[in-house]
């Protein structure tokens, strides 16, 4: 246990715990569970205080560590962790300056916003019992009590939890992690059973006379004497307590806590129906680039100039024709829209000076494709509230779709390496403070593993498209602006390269609210024949626009070039998140860092170099019907990045719901694997909540399928 504590906790916390045990004459070599408990309590106190400040207006605010906070006052004064003399000096000073009542026992924190001392409790038992013990010991209504447990429960005075939900969730997650780490090392049972209650006067002395009578009178209802109450508390069974409480709430509620065994869970039911379709804002694995190397043309860097230069590299244009019509659209309009783009680009080239931006003529085909004048007129509610049959639009339930193999292929492709470099070394960004050697080393290793990854190309493509579209939406609200879809990269030899994927034409964009929609038509080059997987391209009209000569093992071959055209829409908030897709790099880097930290704590030294350079070692990547898939550390980096990127590309309410609900089932299964004997009630309700998120979204359906593979292998 001592080794675990030294690996698991910050050295400063370990040092403070050692001092505290020395001060109370306890041997940490013998009292190892107490050592762990003190460290945990210290860490919770520090996490409680972290990032919370009071601004100049006296309001409580949360500030992340990288923000400048020189003018801000810390919201909490930390008393726990100081030696007794210093701690009492701090308490006395607070009482003198704020007029707060001096507590009988040393509290853990002082809250300058609520002007109260706080006692933090961390328990391995039931929060209600521990709360009662704390309250009994302190006997002061002025000190606020906040109890956390290792199972994610909490209890606070008058249900006032002081902190925002996210800050408390950080603490609960950390406690859950400590518990899991202990369980995996076989230390949890001993630690859980070693907790002694708060020592109070009542426990040390036999109570007689008047005090005894008062104790008997002040018991909760249904208890005749103190002995009965003590016997009840000693034999308290939390599961039964929850059942009882629920049955009191309503006659309909009958929650029996059922043991969760290996045979309990069933697979998640995936919907039946036609196969799901591609719904990303731009093509992924099927996209085709027209590229120029070492661009040095006039106006290089201006999107329209770059686009025209890229278009000139291709000579195989031909009369376009529809090869896969859109089921519900007016397909000739899509064809005319592409012809209009070609014609207007031709017009630009004949001008003396190419303009920086191009607004398309408002032709009938573009008006149709962009939904111009299609939105129903908005009427003020007061003008029509007297209409008897006033009602909202009838909206059809979305049609259920089944999982299709193309989305797994898309994901596999996103994990692959390309022959281009998509991010520079500093793309993730330097730290403001002098960066530690280990942190920069990790970042450089990680960047090297993902810089060639196709998921990284999707990030840069997404950032560019969303930035360009948001800029155009604000700068040219009434215009049908032509926006080239461009990305920049380097070849393996380090030469710069500019790529054109196609074009977007933006519709009217008077975006007042974050969720107001701007319509756009996307036109993207591809070599994929849509007739191979027509269900994937349900929302597209696909044209054949040229023939491309490709080098192959047998010489040059000619392949038809297609243009995937569709009407789409997005909003300010979606574009804002799209512009920030680089965050995916950071998220996956942090996940890799936590793997390195876990390895380093076991080996008691930094394992960054070995982690990335030991090419013989394989790591678990994910579950498939075959079992646990393993791969190199580079493959792990790229898989984690691809997951993060797909979460961004396919963000939806279905994904939010599925992630939140399936996580609950995941935690229960993890608890079972850790031999924590979990119990559940209304497991059917949890499955219902998970399955109502499985409607038609390809990424959610794929995640559900992966979850089923995990269930199969986790419970063998």
Swiss-Prot record:
Binding site for Mn(2+) 1: 41, 108, 119-120
UniProt source species: Influenza A virus (strain A/USA:Memphis/10/1996 H1N1)
Entry's Gene Ontology cellular component terms: host cell cytoplasm; host cell nucleus
Protein name as annotated: Polymerase acidic protein
Motif extent (Nuclear localization signal 1 (NLS1)): 124-139
Binding site for Mn(2+) 2: 80, 108
Cofactor notes: Binds 2 manganese ions per subunit.
Cofactor names: Mn(2+)
Family of this protein: Belongs to the influenza viruses PA family.
One record GO biological process: viral RNA genome replication
EC numbers for this chain: 3.1.-.-
Location(s) in or outside the cell: Host cytoplasm; Host nucleus
Protein's UniProt keywords contain Phosphoprotein: yes
Quaternary organization: Influenza RNA polymerase is composed of three subunits: PB1, PB2 and PA. Interacts (via C-terminus) with PB1 (via N-terminus).
InterPro entries, A to Z: INFV_PA, PA/PA-X, PA/PA-X_sf
Keywords linked to the UniProt accession: Cap snatching, Endonuclease, Eukaryotic host gene expression shutoff by virus, Eukaryotic host transcription shutoff by virus, Host cytoplasm, Host gene expression shutoff by virus, Host nucleus, Host-virus interaction, Hydrolase, Inhibition of host RNA polymerase II by virus, Manganese, Metal-binding, Nuclease, Phosphoprotein
GO molecular function term, any single one: endonuclease activity
PTM notes: Phosphorylated on serines and threonines by host kinases, including human casein kinase II.
HAMAP family: INFV_PA
Flavoprotein found in the keyword field: no
């Amino acid at each position: 246990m001592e080794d675990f504590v030294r690996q698991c906790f910050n050295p400063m916390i370990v040092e403070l715990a050692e001092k505290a045990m020395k001060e109370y004459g306890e041997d940490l070599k013998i009292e190892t569970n107490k050592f762990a408990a003190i460290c945990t309590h210290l860490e919770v106190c520090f996490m409680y205080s972290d990032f919370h400040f009071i601004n100049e207006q006296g309001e409580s605010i949360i500030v992340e560590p990288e923000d400048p906070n020189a003018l801000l006052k810390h919201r909490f004064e930390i008393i726990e962790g100081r030696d007794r003399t210093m701690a009492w000096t701090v308490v006395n000073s607070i009482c003198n300056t704020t007029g707060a009542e001096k507590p009988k026992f040393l509290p853990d924190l002082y809250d300058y916003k609520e002007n109260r001392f706080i006692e933090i409790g961390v328990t391995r038992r039931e929060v209600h019992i521990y709360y009662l013990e704390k309250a009994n010991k302190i006997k002061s209504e002025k000190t606020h009590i906040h109890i956390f447990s290792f199972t994610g429960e909490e209890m606070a005075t008058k249900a006032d939890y002081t902190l925002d939900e996210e800050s408390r969730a950080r603490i609960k997650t950390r406690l859950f992690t400590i518990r899991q780490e202990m369980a995996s090392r076989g230390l949890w049972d001993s630690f859980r059973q070693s907790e002694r209650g708060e020592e109070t006067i009542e426990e040390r002395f036999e109570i007689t006379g008047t005090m005894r009578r008062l104790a008997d009178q002040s018991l909760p209802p249904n208890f005749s004497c103190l002995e009965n109450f003590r016997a009840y508390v000693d034999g308290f069974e939390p599961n039964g307590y929850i059942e009882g409480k629920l049955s009191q709430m309503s006659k309909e509620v009958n929650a029996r806590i059922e043991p969760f065994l290996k045979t309990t869970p069933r697979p998640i039911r995936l919907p039946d129906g036609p196969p799901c379709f591609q719904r990303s804002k731009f093509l992924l694995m099927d996209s085709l680039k027209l590229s120029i190397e070492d661009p040095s043309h006039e106006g290089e860097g201006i999107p329209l100039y770059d686009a025209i230069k890229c278009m000139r590299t291709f000579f195989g244009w031909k009369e376009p024709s529809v090869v896969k019509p859109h089921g519900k659209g007016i397909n000739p309009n899509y064809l005319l829209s592409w012809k209009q783009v070609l014609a207007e680009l031709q017009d630009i080239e004949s001008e003396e000076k190419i303009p920086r931006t191009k607004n398309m003529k408002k032709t009938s085909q573009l008006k149709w494709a962009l939904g111009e004048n299609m939105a129903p007129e908005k009427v003020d509610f007061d003008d029509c509230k007297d209409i008897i049959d006033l009602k909202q639009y009838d909206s059809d339930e979305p049609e259920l779709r089944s999982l299709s193999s193309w989305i797994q292929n898309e994901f596999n492709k996103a994990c692959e390496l390309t022959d281009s470099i998509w991010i520079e070394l500093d793309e993730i960004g330097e730290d403001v403070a002098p960066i530690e050697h280990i942190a920069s080393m990790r970042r450089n290793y990680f960047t090297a593993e993902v810089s060639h990854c196709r998921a990284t190309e999707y990030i840069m493509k997404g950032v560019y498209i969303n930035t360009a579209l948001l800029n155009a939406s604000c700068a040219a609200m009434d215009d049908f602006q032509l926006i080239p879809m461009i990305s920049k990269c380097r070849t393996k030899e380090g030469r710069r390269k500019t790529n054109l994927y196609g074009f977007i034409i933006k519709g009217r964009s008077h975006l007042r609210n974050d969720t107001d929609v701007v319509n756009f038509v996307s036109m993207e080059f591809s070599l994929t024949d849509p007739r191979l997987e027509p269900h994937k391209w349900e929302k597209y009209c696909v044209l054949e626009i040229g023939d491309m000569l490709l080098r192959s093992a047998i010489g040059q071959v000619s392949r038809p070039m297609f243009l995937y055209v569709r009407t789409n829409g997005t909003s300010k908030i979606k574009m804002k998140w799209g512009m920030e897709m680089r965050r995916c790099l950071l998220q996956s880097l942090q996940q890799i860092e936590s793997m390195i930290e876990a390895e380093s704590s076991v080996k008691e030294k930094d394992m960054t170099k070995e982690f990335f350079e030991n090419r013989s070692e394989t790591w678990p990547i994910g579950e498939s019907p075959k079992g646990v898939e393993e791969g190199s550390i580079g493959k792990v980096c790229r898989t984690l990045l691809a997951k993060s990127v797909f979460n961004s590309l396919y963000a939806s309410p279905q994904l939010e719901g599925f992630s939140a609900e399936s996580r609950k089932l995941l935690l229960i299964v993890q608890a079972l694997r850790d031999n924590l004997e979990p119990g559940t009630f209304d497991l059917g309700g949890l499955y219902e909540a998970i399955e109502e998120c499985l409607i038609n979204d390809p990424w959610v359906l794929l995640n559900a399928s992966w979850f089923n593979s995990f269930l199969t292998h986790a419970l063998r």
